């Protein structure tokens, strides 16, 4: 087998081994990206964002969005907002 053919064969087989070892890519979830983008635009950023990411200085409210800091309950590990009226 000539050198060029051998090289092409190796280049064809190599990516298949890499894909099998890594596995398929995770499914893309557009809803999570939209929520994350909305939170970056509207939610109040402070030094430790993990518990306060749902709290905002503005009176915003929503399921996975954020709500005003006055009504945001951050007593547990995750902040919760009251239901929208």
Swiss-Prot record:
Expressed by the venom duct. Residues 22-40 form a propeptide. It comes from the Eukaryota. GO terms for molecular function: toxin activity. Keywords: Disulfide bond, Neurotoxin, Secreted, Signal, Toxin. GO terms for cellular component: extracellular region. It is found in: Secreted. The keyword Signal applies. The keyword Signal applies. Residues 1-21 form the signal peptide. Probable neurotoxin. This is Conotoxin Lt28.2. It comes from Conus litteratus (Lettered cone).
């Amino acid at each position: 087998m000539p050198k060029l053919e051998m090289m092409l064969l190796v280049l064809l087989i190599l990516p298949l081994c890499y894909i099998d070892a890594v596995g398929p890519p995770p499914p893309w979830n557009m809803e999570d990206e939209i929520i994350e983008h909305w939170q970056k635009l509207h939610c109040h950023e402070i030094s430790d964002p993990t518990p306060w990411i749902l709290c905002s200085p503005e009176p915003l409210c929503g399921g996975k969005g954020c709500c005003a800091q006055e009504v945001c309950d951050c007593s547990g590990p995750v902040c919760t907002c009251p239901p929208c009226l």
